[in-house]
């Protein structure tokens, strides 16, 4: 037994039938466009919620003062610590140095092997940095592929010895991609600045260290560099 719609279509002349089919087709097209728009709106809303969640996690991380990945103090804690330490160094009259450590090939590792392995590299480098400094010093996660260290009672020459030791251990890291058992080569660039040799201001000290780091990376990276006075 034919459906009512099929019966109507059979009884219609060809032009009328064609118009009806076109009308139904346009209606379906309109519905599809509406569904696609709704889907895109939902995707945008999902992206917005993800961004809000990431921002919230960053705020929580900042308030806690600890970097989730490395378990080191975060940038917020580092800057507060550096500010207070500089005041004390100036008042007491001792040297203080900072190291800015950038993992040279982290972006390449992320693209080639995935972000999970990239996170492993960051964690292992953080372990090396922490193991290479004293209890009185402060290693921290600056963000992305960068770590920082406050070295108390240490001038630029002493900081250079620490930095070279850290770099050597980073170069000797034994990390393997489990998918194809290939060895992952890790390198880093480390910049040094000191108070009072280079500056006694937090922002200026960080700025000149960043500039030195950039110069070293442009020269090929995988080296230790001291900021210019």
Regions inferred by a protein language model and the residue ranges of each:
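Conserved nucleotide-binding and Mg2+-coordinating catalytic segments in signaling enzymes
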Residues: 61-80, 101-114, 123
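Catalytic-core segments of nucleotide cyclases and related cyclic-nucleotide turnover enzymes
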Residues: 160, 164, 193-229
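A short glycine-centered flexible hinge/capping loop motif at secondary-structure junctions
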Residues: 110-118, 143-144, 220-221
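Non-catalytic regulatory/interaction regions at protein termini and inter-domain linkers
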Residues: 1-12
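GGDEF/GGEEF active-site signature
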Residues: 124-197, 226
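Nucleotide second-messenger and two-component phosphorelay signaling modules
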Residues: 59, 64, 84-97, 101, ...
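Heptad-repeat coiled-coil signal-transmission/dimerization helices
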Residues: 78, 82, 122, 126-129, ...
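Signal-transducing coiled-coil linker helices
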Residues: 24, 28-69, 76-87, 137-140, ...
């Amino acid at each position: 037994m034919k459906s009512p719609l099929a019966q109507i279509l059979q009884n219609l002349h060809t032009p009328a039938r064609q118009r009806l089919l076109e009308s139904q087709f346009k209606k379906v097209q309109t519905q599809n466009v509406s569904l696609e728009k709704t889907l895109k709106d939902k995707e945008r809303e999902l992206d917005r919620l993800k961004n809000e969640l990431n921002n919230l996690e960053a705020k929580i991380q900042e308030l806690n003062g600890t970097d989730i990945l490395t378990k080191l103090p975060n940038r917020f804690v580092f800057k507060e610590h550096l500010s207070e330490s500089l005041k004390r160094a100036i008042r007491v009259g001792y040297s203080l140095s900072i190291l800015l450590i950038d993992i040279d090939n982290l972006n390449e590792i992320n693209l080639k092997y995935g972000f999970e392995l990239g996170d492993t590299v960051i964690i292992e480098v953080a372990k090396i940095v922490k193991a290479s400094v004293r209890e009185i010093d402060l290693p921290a996660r600056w963000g992305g592929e960068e770590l920082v260290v406050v070295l108390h009672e240490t001038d630029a020459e002493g900081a250079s010895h620490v930095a070279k030791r850290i770099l050597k251990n980073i170069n000797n890291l034994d990390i393997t991609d489990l998918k194809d058992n290939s060895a992952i080569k890790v390198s880093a660039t480390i910049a040094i600045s000191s108070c009072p040799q280079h500056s006694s201001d937090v922002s200026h000290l960080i700025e000149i260290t960043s500039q030195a780091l950039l110069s070293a990376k442009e020269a090929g990276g995988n080296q230790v560099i001291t900021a210019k006075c």
